[in-house]
Regions:
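Conserved phosphate-binding/catalytic region of the ribokinase-like
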Residues: 1-4, 190-299
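Conserved N-terminal subdomain of the carbohydrate kinase-like
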Residues: 40-121, 293-299
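Proline-centered loop/turn at the N-terminus of a beta-strand
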Residues: 5, 145, 171, 207-208
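Structural alpha-helical scaffold elements that stabilize or flank donor/cofactor-binding regions
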Residues: 109-110, 164-165, 202
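Short, conserved phosphate/pyrophosphate- and ester-handling motifs at nucleotide-, phospho-/glycolipid
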Residues: 34, 175, 244
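Conserved beta-alpha-beta core of the PfkB/ribokinase-like small-molecule kinase fold
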Residues: 116, 121-195, 217
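Glycine-rich phosphate/adenosyl-contacting loop at the front of the ribokinase-like
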Residues: 1-65, 79, 236
Length: 299
């Protein structure tokens, strides 16, 4: 039986951590973790014709990510990451290779075969990549999961962009801090966080809305009314880079493989906890599988 196909659209880059550089970019982090959870993953992005670009593609291939990555004359993307108690702050270099992803029929054909697509706001910050990604989203097949992780960074977003991307999505992931901003931006009626998530579901006809609360909880609401809430297990944190993306990729891979909402949610929480114990967004998975931190916490 063939594996489901997952495609990530947007940034591929180096996270320049205090301990050294690590391959990353939210959509590609997603693709990596989907590939570790029963999916065949591809990244659509761009790197520069430079040493960093060649090294980045090599790392992606070694990690099991198939790349549909263009090479252009702009520098490969980098992000300076400062860590405070393991929590990252990002300084994102502008006008880099992934700001110049060009549309091709080959990319459109790949997207048309995907069972799931992942995208966020950052990858569309430039007009060129915005136009390409929007055009590619128009080629998704019926029934595909279209995962929009809002993933707000710096000032690289607007209400118009968020509305546009929600119009293409059927899964929406947002964290509790971002939800506060979205309440004001969209003038969401007063109510608890779950009601605010349901507001997005109703307005944009979403299949799932995912709300994460970092070190405390996560809630997933399905269109049919099923809800799953899990507390975040406590682990010794190396850094949280890519943890949210690992949650998303794991959840999507499991759903595509036939897992129930609760099964997929549990796998996502355990995966994110595991990633927090490692440096960078693409840690190797244990041969025996990710530990069941939730089971350990329940004892």
């Amino acid at each position: 039986m063939s594996k489901p196909i997952v495609i990530a659209l947007g940034e591929i880059l180096w996270d320049m951590l205090p301990t050294g550089k690590r391959a990353g970019g939210a959509p590609v982090n997603f693709a990596y973790h989907a590939s570790q959870n029963c999916a065949e993953s591809y990244a659509i992005s761009a790197v520069g014709n430079d040493e960093l670009g060649a090294e980045l593609l090599n790392d992606a291939h070694k990690a099991g990510i198939n790349t549909l990555v263009q090479t252009n004359e702009y520098p490969t993307g980098t992000v300076a990451v400062a860590l405070t108690n393991g929590i990252p702050e990002y300084t994102i270099v502008q006008n880099v290779a992934w700001d110049h992803i060009g549309y091709t029929d080959e990319l459109a054909e790949a997207v048309s075969k995907a069972d799931a697509i992942c995208f966020g706001t950052l990858g569309l910050r430039s007009q060129e990549s915005h136009d390409t990604i929007i055009k590619l989203l128009q080629h998704t097949k019926e029934g595909a999961l279209k995962f929009f992780d809002i993933n707000l960074r710096a000032n690289f977003y607007s209400k118009e962009l968020i509305e546009e991307l929600l119009g293409y999505a059927n899964i929406f992931k947002i964290n509790d801090d971002e939800l506060i901003m979205m309440r004001e931006m969209f003038s969401i009626p007063e109510g608890n966080d779950e009601e605010a998530c349901k507001w997005f579901m109703d307005r944009f006809d979403l299949e799932y809305t995912i709300l994460t609360g970092g070190a405390t909880f996560s809630t997933i609401i399905a269109k049919d009314g099923e809800t799953s809430t899990l507390l975040t297990p406590h682990v010794e944190v190396a850094d949280t880079v890519g943890a949210g993306d690992s949650f998303s990729g794991s959840f999507t891979g499991k759903i595509l493989s036939g897992a129930s909402l609760k099964e997929a949610h549990r796998a996502a929480v355990n995966t994110a906890a595991y990633v927090c114990t490692k440096e960078g967004g693409w840690p190797a998975y244990p041969t025996e599988g990710v530990p069941d931190y939730l089971a350990a916490a329940a004892k």
